[in-house]
A protein has these predicted regions:
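Class I S-adenosyl-L-methionine
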Residues: 15-22, 45, 71, 92
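Non-catalytic signal-transmission and effector/linker regions of two-component phosphorelay proteins
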Residues: 1-3
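CheY-like receiver
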Residues: 41-43, 50-104
Length: 104
């Protein structure tokens, strides 16, 4: 079963991802929705998560720092960046952090 944390500050995007995942995948549980990096870190510490969908441009702690933190706390979790930015520097940083996938 996928236990997913969605990290996205835009409510419409967050809700769309949640609905899409729940309607199209079997064995999915959305265990948390974070609107900021701070909320994401709190949820990483307190919830059973094995897949993270992380936006890069979020308030507080940015998405890359959330990913870095998640990699330390949840080394086996799948981490997917969700972003509207197609900047090479973001992709390069994501590779260094061993992100599993990158969705534009």
């Amino acid at each position: 079963m996928y236990k997913i944390l969605i990290v996205e500050d835009e409510e419409l995007e967050r809700t769309s991802m949640k609905i899409f995942l729940e309607e199209n995948l079997l064995d999915v549980e959305i265990v948390g929705e974070a609107k900021s990096g701070f909320e994401a870190v709190e949820m990483i510490d307190s919830k059973d998560i094995n897949l993270l969908l992380v936006d890069i441009n979020i308030p507080g702690i940015d998405g890359m720092e959330v990913i870095k933190y998640a990699r330390k706390k949840l080394p086996k979790a799948v981490i997917i960046i969700t972003t509207a930015y197609d900047d090479f520097n973001i992709a390069h940083r994501a590779i260094k952090l061993k992100v599993d996938d990158f969705l534009l």
